């Protein structure tokens, strides 16, 4: 059959005027039209595979009635509607909602399965179920079928039945925007140029050239027209029947003029007319950013052909290269037409590749969203977080995901689920070798950290000149209690939970956010340690209250007894003085010097009149006084009895004064003074050695912990050093206070504190070596350290709080009790805060 291409060109020039007139009326009047415009590739960039939105005013029924993709379209729209209602807002998915969807699917971050689950299998659902058990969201019983879904999503059974218009009727539906459920264009997209023209090209009645293209309503058997252009451009304006009628009249008039100019086309059989591309401008010029969002894109894109194809369907295979070029030219920034063929009609529209202008061919090389831009390959073989996923699709974290964009993202989500990139087993994680820090940096940071912490022992020097004597005693009481609280709190709240493996010190490896876990479950070991501290504190309060009650009852009940006892002591003292005054100086020489043991007893009992009894003057055992036999190294002159009276009184007074101030008087008290000084030195030495050993073990354990942490990670070691510094500050001041209370000078206390601080270097060396050259020993180091801390706190320092200097405590016992409680509670609180927030104490220096 003859084809007249010249007249076809003239026909297109006429249609050009018609389309320009129709387009202007369409935009001004805002009416909906379906134009079956069968022209090929003009200067607009609409894709031939572009699928439009279906509006909510009933046109969707006419468009998809009888279509092969009708069930798929409605099913797709239904499930997208449900997902957007659950995770989206106003028919859009924001970043937070999409993130929740990814986490529900087990995507977006790498998660480690730490439980054995051979009986459950290794499918994706089983892994998600086990991860929920690990997170504490639910637990399994012995006979549990292990078929949970995400507990964060309410289980609802939506029963939907298909009616004639294939609209879903939900039995239980979440209230959502009606526009999405019916397939209408979302509000944010309705502003774009989405045209939905319906033009009936009714030419002259004498002509067989009828353009009545309702491609969707015509069945494939009756469609012999080889036209693949489906321009179903939806427009968001309301339909105006008056404007539509007026446009149809104008259209009929233009069609008649068109038929009169081209009468020779009336004899043509239009069923086999091939529309070739012609170089003429087209009024439908849309910017590349013109996006057609649709929830019904998938139904029109069918991978299979209709059951019955027309006879001229074989034309489709004659020029495959031109068809591919035509499809490749119509890629837009959002619609994906790659490797998809339109099969809803049996028409074919052939374009000549040579007819495309260079500008048109350049526009045809647009990339599909998600394809590598500028030749840069995207990372697909790893677990992608939401930001990476959106970036690969040309979106940002601020973008709102439309239903069409969501359909493009779905293959990536399915691929991530199928390849199991985001779920790993614990043995796979442990098998990955971690890059160990340099040994030089480990040793250097360890020594620097220990040196800074050890210098805290010099901090006590600053406190001595500032405070007076009375305030300093109260400060010492507070610091001792603070040391007890920090030591016992660090052992029970920090070290023991770490030794049990609740969480480790590798802070640098925990920078990524972990899924939220119940606060009580996450710090279960810390709460149990806090309960143990509560038991210690309760018994301390009970024992201290019992001692205070006993002290006050003794003061109240023994007041009269003490007065009576004081009067008897005065009478005895007078009699003793009278007896002593009757003795001469020669008789005083018969007094035996007190032995060291007597001096010790005298020091303990504070008895001023404790002496050896003199022999009576008329005693038969009285021997003549011989000065040479005297044990004294010097000679005493013999005085008269009158001169001896004041001397005896002065001797008695001097002896008593010597006991009160520790000064020796005469030959007899010299031995007692020597014994008291030795005892004092022995007591100081004992306390000093106890502090050196106790505090030294404490510093040694600190060095072990710091060395082990630095050997694992530089950043984690610095964080551990910060935690040690926080409890070493009150502990070193507490030790300084204990040494001062033992009778040491400030200089001696500083020296002993520095000696104990040297043990931290030894601990750091051992901890670093063990951490670098052994495996899984750090937890045992923490356990040993916790035992040492408890011993120092409960055996050495807590008794000092309970049984301190009775004279000082009796003066203001309630004040000391309040300070002790405040110090212990402060220490407990410091260690509790470190135990809870230590993962956030991370100092990243880029190592």
From Swiss-Prot:
Membrane topology type: Multi-pass membrane protein
Glycan-bearing residues: 385
Catalytic activity: Zn(2+)(in) = Zn(2+)(out)
Free-text description of this protein's post-translational modifications in UniProt: Undergoes N-terminal ectodomain shedding.
Main location: membrane
Compartments where found: Cell membrane; Apical cell membrane
Keyword field: Cell membrane, Glycoprotein, Ion transport, Membrane, Signal, Transmembrane, Transmembrane helix, Transport, Zinc, Zinc transport
Outcome of gene disruption: Morpholino knockdown of the protein causes delayed epiboly and deformities of the head, eye, heart and tail.
Ranges annotated as spanning the membrane: 447-467, 474-494, 529-549, 705-725, 750-770, 779-799, 817-837
Keyword flag NADP: no
Disulfide bonds: none
Biased composition annotated in UniProt, kind: Basic and acidic residues: 162-171, 190-269, 629-646
GO BP term (any one): epiboly involved in gastrulation with mouth forming second
GO CC, one annotated term: plasma membrane
InterPro entries: ZIP (IPR003689), ZIP_Transporter (IPR050799)
N-terminal signal peptide: 1-26
GO molecular function ontology, one term from the record: zinc ion transmembrane transporter activity
Stretches with biased composition (Basic residues): 270-285, 314-330, 648-672
Pfam families given in the database record: Zip
Region described as Disordered: spans on this chain: 136-374, 613-676
Comp. bias (Polar residues): 179-188
Family stated for the protein in its record: Belongs to the ZIP transporter (TC 2.A.5) family.
Described function: Zinc-influx transporter. When associated with slc39a6, the heterodimer slc39a10/slc39a6 has a functional role in epithelial-mesenchymal transition (EMT) during embryonic development. Slc39a10/slc39a6 heterodimers play also an essentiel role in initiating mitosis by importing zinc into cells to initiate a pathway resulting in the onset of mitosis. When associated with slc39a6, the heterodimer controls Ncam1 phosphorylation and integration into focal adhesion complexes during EMT.
Name assigned to this protein: Zinc transporter ZIP10
